[in-house]
Each structure stands twice: as structure tokens, then as C-alpha cells.
């Protein structure tokens, strides 16, 4: 239930803020850096402060902890889903937009009947990959350290925390089985039917979808009275949402309010930027007063070490899983086989595997510093793989036919056809992987298995240690340092890549 509520809030957030970012440049200049920034903020940074907020909001009630867990699921899904929806809204083919305008669609109908529909396949795929981050967040949020004690909610997360503390390997295996069962049920009852249904929204020849099989639950709904009743209900809701509400809106003359407000765009832009600057100055001053100053001299070295591990993990993930994702995505049969397997592996929290790595390191006297790189990859590689598969699946059939006509092979096939076609999805994948990488770095640089603790020097280790000790000022300093690294990545890496993806690699 916590997972589903978090997913619902993530979808609502994605639609609202993706549309605002795609439509209004002043908002886009703030929303995109903010979302990229928040995506890479470590989960413990949210939990440290949101836990206190929700506990004070609902004193003497378990509702505060429930809200913390739901918000943790939200932070694991919302940023990735919003970025995907924004990306697809920006690359809607011009001929489709011109066709919608020729049918005299109003802006409301144009969004829901064209732009949102065009974005649904990619959004659904990223909702599936975001599921892994959501489970990671949910597991972490069901057992939260507060000071010298741990507050737990009933659930798989608290069960895993107890199993790790007791070094109980069978209990960890039971938790893996329970998570796998949940993921398989979601795949069979929700995601597979939705993937099959939304295949009709891909921008290509309808004959390209014939290779897709019909999942058993999709067939059950399609040929049942329940499915027919559900279809009638959805059609009635669509008629209300797409036609009756816009007619009421225009009948009441509410559209004139937007025209009136548009006349003062310069004023709203000025007030918006002024508000953003004042908020940044105020929060920056409060944080500076809150930070412990004795750690400043050591932060650059810690930041450099953790950044090197994260960068190495991300580059290896792209180099290894881009070819693998292309191989899977080109074959619908392989997608059908590997999709549930990848979902199960992706949704299993990486820290479950860390005790096995810790045992290996202890036995063979290895250095945790280098071993942290493959451990970080466990939390990043699935983002790249899912986005590459989504990108390959979304390539229009016409583009594929052109590449076959020119006889592209091997290196030329990658350079002139495949990599340009999936480049926007690779960009989304590595940005999403960055968020998972920073979270994984915190968990990977300090491993605890019962009474045994292994650690590597780095910013992630500092954040993990001070958070477990309940030192909020030190935790805030570590999270702020990690956020500074993220901000540098946004300015010098992610934004240039976004511009290239939007201008050079777009279907027109």
C-alpha cells in the first residue's frame, strides 16, 4: 500500500511539473536543475529531515512514520518519471502537432490526446525502472535511526534490517523471495497489461505491434464482463475529462484569466526569479550557521574519492549495459523473457548483497575502496538498462527501415543509427543512474554485517557514519557537499547533454 500511494503521488507530480517545465521557460530554468539536484540528493538527506517533520506533524501517531515511508517511495520514483515525461513532451514530432491543430484541438485536448499519449510508453517504462529505486527507498525508510534508537514500521524493510543485524542468512533469503513475489505480481497484473495496451500509442506503423504477445491477464480483462464494464467507465471519464470540462471552462470564460495574466509575463518572471534568489540566500545562510566548521578541511578529499567511484561505476554501467539493452530491445521475445527478470533483480535492494561482499573482502583481505565501485553499480546499472531498452523499443519503424536501406553495419550502424536514436534515453538513464549512484555510495562505503564493520574513506562513509550516530548538523553538511557535486554535474554535464538530445537527436 505504501508503494502504490507513493507511485500515485509520483505520477501526479510528474504530470504537473513536466508540463510546467515544457511550457514555460522561466519555470524550466528552475524546475530542471531542481529535479536533477533532488534526484541525486542522497536518500538519508531526505530521511534525516522529513522524519522529524512528519513526526512533529503527527505527534504520538504512527501516521508520521507512514508519511515518511510514502515520501521516501516518492523520492525514489518522482524525479526519474518527471524527467522522462519532460523529455518526451519536448520531442513530439511536428507533423503530429500540426495534425492536432488542424483538428482544432484546444490546448487541453492537444495535451491529453497527443502529447501525453505520445509520452505514455516511455513514462510507463520509467515507472517500471523507478520501481527499483522505490523499493530501495521503502526498505530504508521502514527502519529509520533516530538518535540512539531505531524506529521501525511493520514491513519487509524492518524485517531485512533485523536480519542483517542478526546475521541471519535464511531470513535475508526469505525477504528476497517476498520482494520477488511482490514484483512478479505487479509485473503480471499491472505492468505487462499496460505495456501491451500502450503499444498502440507508439509513433510507428501499427503492424509493428503484431509481434507483441497478449499477456494472460490482458486477455482475461479484454474478454470478460469486468473488462467491458471497466472500458465503459474509462470512456465515460475520458468524455468528461476531454470534452465536458473544457466546454465548461470556456463557457465560464475562465480562459480569459490566462490571457489577462499573460500580459504581465515580465512582472511574473521578475517576481519568480527574485523569489528564487531570496529563498536561496535565506536557506544558504541558515545552513551555513547550522554546519559544523571543523570538517571543512577534509571535505575536498572525501568528495574527490567518492566522485571518482561514482564516475567509474556510471561509465562502466553505460559501457556494459548499453549494448546489452540494445540486444534485448531489438527482439520483442527477449524483452518478454528478460523484462520480469530485470525487474526482480533491479528491485532487490543492493545492500542485501553487501554482506556477501563483506565476507569476501574480510576473508581475502581486500580493499573496500575499489570494491565499492561494483557495489555502486548494483544501484545504477538497471537505470541505464531500462532506459536503453525503452529507447530501442520506441524507435519508429520508419527509421529502422531507412538504416536497412542504406545497409549500415557494425561501427557505422552504431554511429549513424542506433546511438543517435537512443541518445535521449541514454541521457535520461545516466542522469537517473547518478541519483542511484550517490545513494549506493553511502551504503557501499560502510558495510555492516552483525558486529563487523568495513569502511572506505569517502563522503559516503562520512554521511553514513554521522547519520547512524544521529548527528544532524554533520549529516546536513555531508548531504550539502554531495549536493554541491550534483550541482556541478548539472551545470557542466547534464544541461549540455539535454541540449544536444533535444536539438540534434530528435525525430522530425
Pin down the residues of each PLM region:
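Periplasmic/extracellular loop-to-transmembrane helix junction in inner-membrane transport proteins
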Residues: 1-8, 165, 243-316, 331
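Transmembrane-helix boundary motif in ABC transporter permease subunits
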Residues: 5-35, 312-342, 355
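C-terminal transmembrane helix and the adjacent membrane-cytosol boundary/short C-terminal tail
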Residues: 25, 173-249, 332-334, 472-508
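Generic hydrophobic transmembrane alpha-helix motif, especially the helices
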Residues: 36-76, 343-380
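Transmembrane-helix bundle segments that line or gate the permeation/cavity pathway
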Residues: 72, 76-92, 98, 119-211, ...
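Short cytoplasmic-facing helical segments at TM-TM junctions of multi-pass membrane proteins
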Residues: 84-123, 127, 387-428, 463
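Transmembrane alpha-helices
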Residues: 107-141, 174, 178, 190, ...
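Glycine-rich helix-loop "coupling/hinge" segments at transmembrane-helix boundaries
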Residues: 136-169, 203, 439-476, 481-482, ...
